[in-house]
Amino acid sequence: MGVPCIVMRLILVSALLVSVSLEHSDMVCAQTIRLTEETDKQALLEFKSQVSETSRVVLGSWNDSLPLCSWTGVKCGLKHRRVTGVDLGGLKLTGVVSPFVGNLSFLRSLNLADNFFHGAIPSEVGNLFRLQYLNMSNNLFGGVIPVVLSNCSSLSTLDLSSNHLEQGVPLEFGSLSKLVLLSLGRNNLTGKFPASLGNLTSLQMLDFIYNQIEGEIPGDIARLKQMIFFRIALNKFNGVFPPPIYNLSSLIFLSITGNSFSGTLRPDFGSLLPNLQILYMGINSFTGTIPETLSNISSLRQLDIPSNHLTGKIPLSFGRLQNLLLLGLNNNSLGNYSSGDLDFLGALTNCSQLQYLNVGFNKLGGQLPVFIANLSTQLTELSLGGNLISGSIPHGIGNLVSLQTLDLGENLLTGKLPPSLGELSELRKVLLYSNGLSGEIPSSLGNISGLTYLYLLNNSFEGSIPSSLGSCSYLLDLNLGTNKLNGSIPHELMELPSLVVLNVSFNLLVGPLRQDIGKLKFLLALDVSYNKLSGQIPQTLANCLSLEFLLLQGNSFVGPIPDIRGLTGLRFLDLSKNNLSGTIPEYMANFSKLQNLNLSLNNFDGAVPTEGVFRNTSAMSVFGNINLCGGIPSLQLQPCSVELPRRHSSVRKIITICVSAVMAALLLLCLCVVYLCWYKLRVKSVRANNNENDRSFSPVKSFYEKISYDELYKTTGGFSSSNLIGSGNFGAVFKGFLGSKNKAVAIKVLNLCKRGAAKSFIAECEALGGIRHRNLVKLVTICSSSDFEGNDFRALVYEFMPNGNLDMWLHPDEIEETGNPSRTLGLFARLNIAIDVASALVYLHTYCHNPIAHCDIKPSNILLDKDLTAHVSDFGLAQLLLKFDRDTFHIQFSSAGVRGTIGYAAPEYGMGGHPSIMGDVYSFGIVLLEIFTGKRPTNKLFVDGLTLHSFTKSALQKRQALDITDETILRGAYAQHFNMVECLTLVFRVGVSCSEESPVNRISMAEAISKLVSIRESFFRDEET
């Protein structure tokens, strides 16, 4: 055999081996294909097994009897029949996502949006290197975002929004070079904005809304030239308006609302971002003027910059924005209360597509122009409230046929309401409160069948309440209080099935409260106080089972209290200043939610119950009912006589009548003698001491003057410094003792040399004289006289609080009496005090006939009685909202006192903002944080922008509630009994929510007290019982 044969044989053998090898390879490939198809199937079945049985039914086709590629939501490739897409969006599936999903190696699209998946996102998803579309939004996923998702290098869409994901955005996401959409909004993400995202040059949409990401926006973002949608609203970003955003000239949608951006906006803003259609920048701290160049953005459709600190005029050039749909500039400082402030409204008549216009709560002045009637007929909301706009509402308002909300409240408007309002059939809210409007309420308002809110309170409307309002069948809140309305309450109002609030207080209404009041099944609050209503209180009130506030005081109701034992949700019940008679029902002691009960100045007789609300004299009042007996000892009522046996009852009755008649005659004779003596002394005193002050203070004197200067001088030792217990904005407070029982009192002497003190005196008398609440300090009497040198003298005499003020308890080391180790407050006591203060503020803000803003809530104005119950004091700063003296408004508000105390005063007060109940909310929030941290807002720790609010907020984000808590609390025993961290965290959150810088971001006092009471019930149930 030669070499050629050997070679030939080797070639033949090699060919055979190759043939065998190829055949084996084909077999292996076929087997591999079969295995991988089976792998996809098993992966999906494993996925199904992790879905709860109740929601698994929609995956019924996922079984061995049907081909894999025909399963619900499954898509396969045409060539290899491998699974390339899984779309289970919106199927409401519950469970966890199986890690076997990572075995779907050909998967290009995975949609699990709008389900209820929970747990962590499996890291195995990072194995899907072909994945282009991943949507897991609107689920319940928690934990961190898996860094391995950055391995999915083909991703163009990544949507993990609306979950509970935590920690930061992975820096590695900067390597996803094909990413077009990145949506991580509505999670709990923290940390900084990754600069690496500047590498995503294909990115067009970025959404980080509603997280807790902080810091500044990195300059690298300027490289995202294709960006058209950029939303980082409701985070914690700070610094000036992000400079790199000015380079994103392709932007169509920009939202940075609800952060802490500050500084001014560039004048060329509109030239740099010429393609914007939607611009949201509200709830930040921007200052300066609105850039005129915004009007160069011809495509602009929505411009919303509320709740900042913008000043200057609203540009007339906005009239060039032909596509404008929405303009929101409310809660700034735009305008200067001058006549030209509203000129922009004329320019906006050119914006024919305008649907929403809100410039409320600025500094706009001038007359309401008639050309507002020429605004777009597509306008659905017109809000100009909270300014100083004068003039009248033009008849042409009826041209705005699409209007749903009309808010002109808290202005200086006068004149009559135009009947054309009734032509606006789409109206839902009419808010015209706190103006000087007069005339009759137009009956045409009854034509607005869909009306839900009608606020006409605090005007000068007269005439009767239109019966046509009974046609407004969707009315929820009807507030006509503090007007001059007369006649009776129309029975048509009792036919409103959805009415929740009915307030007709402080009018001149007559007649009975109608029996058909019981038809209002959903009524939460009924206030008919201070009218001239008569007759008996209808028994049908018992049918209003939702009632929480029933205010009938200041009328002429007669007869007994009806059986309303079914109204177990009552919180405030005031029947005072009527002619009611009979006994006080025992069942009222079972009203467990009742916070305030006032039965004073009636003709009730019999025994006062001793349980429930009747155990607390600060929560109820029965004075002025001379025939009452019994009750708890502190009421100091006569004891109830023991009932006599029946056989002697008639004789005893005759004896009782005779004796009573004789005693009454003697008493009357004595009273006449006393009165004549007093009258002679009174005339002599008036002639000797009273001068022109009689004219200024006569309404107050006639009701309050019960004590002389001489008495106060003696009881305070000549106003000696040894009896000085404090001082405030308008004077000093001394301790004294009055009456035969030497009752301790606190005497507040007003400093009349300080501007506003006399007005403070009148305001405080008016405020305290008309309200009663267990957490408000009680006014005992006043003195309006002259001192020994003939100078005017004004003093308020309060009930003395033996435990001083809250400031002494929170900061005992700063008081001279540092040796008192018992002056400490535990967690439960502090929470109770906070709830007491909140309760007083809710009452002032909501249940007085005019809302009252205290304007100086701070620990030294919170007094503690012997039981450590808190009482809010010092109404010297209180302004009765909605009743400002229009002529001297600016003078009154410019006084230093009304702006509150540094550290506790709301930020808007420092910028000329109106005194408001939301300012009290801020002050309460700061006090609440001080109560539990033990740190004053003026602590030297708070510098360089750090405040008690931001200090607490930062600690909450880091879950360090215990680290900022007052050590006195931590030394207590509570930590052994319950989760103190959770309790403190919840309390701090309430304080932070109340003390937000912008008023619109603060919760109401009603919401605050609800949260605090809920915390107490959750953690201190044993202590309460």
From Swiss-Prot:
Residues bearing the modification Phosphothreonine:
T716
* Superkingdom in the source lineage: Eukaryota
Residues forming coiled coils? none
* PROSITE patterns, per database record: PROTEIN_KINASE_ATP, PROTEIN_KINASE_DOM, PROTEIN_KINASE_ST
Compartment list: Cell membrane
Q: Which GO terms describe its molecular function?
A: ATP binding; protein serine kinase activity; protein serine/threonine kinase activity
Q: Which UniProt keywords apply?
A: ATP-binding, Cell membrane, Glycoprotein, Kinase, Leucine-rich repeat, Membrane, Nucleotide-binding, Phosphoprotein, Receptor, Repeat, Serine/threonine-protein kinase, Signal, Transferase, Transmembrane, Transmembrane helix
* Record: residues binding ATP: I725, G726, S727, G728, N729, F730, G731, A732, V733, K748
Extracellular side stretches: 31-653
Q: Which PANTHER family match?
A: LEUCINE-RICH REPEAT PROTEIN KINASE FAMILY PROTEIN, RECEPTOR-LIKE PROTEIN 55
**What is the recorded name of this protein?**
Putative receptor-like protein kinase At3g47110
Instruction: Tell me the ranges holding the LRR repeats.
Output: 104-128, 130-151, 152-175, 176-200, 202-224, 226-248, 249-271, 273-297, 298-323, 325-344, 351-374, 376-400, 401-424, 426-448, 449-472, 473-496, 498-520, 521-544, 546-567, 568-593, 595-616
Primary location class: membrane
Tell me which residues make up the Protein kinase domain.
Answer: 719-1020
Which residues face the membrane's Cytoplasmic side? 675-1025
Signal sequence extent: 1-30
List, alphabetically, the InterPro entries matched.
Kinase-like_dom_sf (IPR011009), Leu-rich_rpt (IPR001611), Leu-rich_rpt_typical-subtyp (IPR003591), LRR_dom_sf (IPR032675), LRR_N_plant-typ (IPR013210), LRR_R13L4/SHOC2-like (IPR055414), Prot_kinase_dom (IPR000719), Protein_kinase_ATP_BS (IPR017441)
Do you know which SUPFAM superfamilies this protein is assigned to? L domain-like (SSF52058), Protein kinase-like (PK-like) (SSF56112), RNI-like (SSF52047)
Write down the chemical reaction(s) this protein catalyses.
L-seryl-[protein] + ATP = O-phospho-L-seryl-[protein] + ADP + H(+); L-threonyl-[protein] + ATP = O-phospho-L-threonyl-[protein] + ADP + H(+)
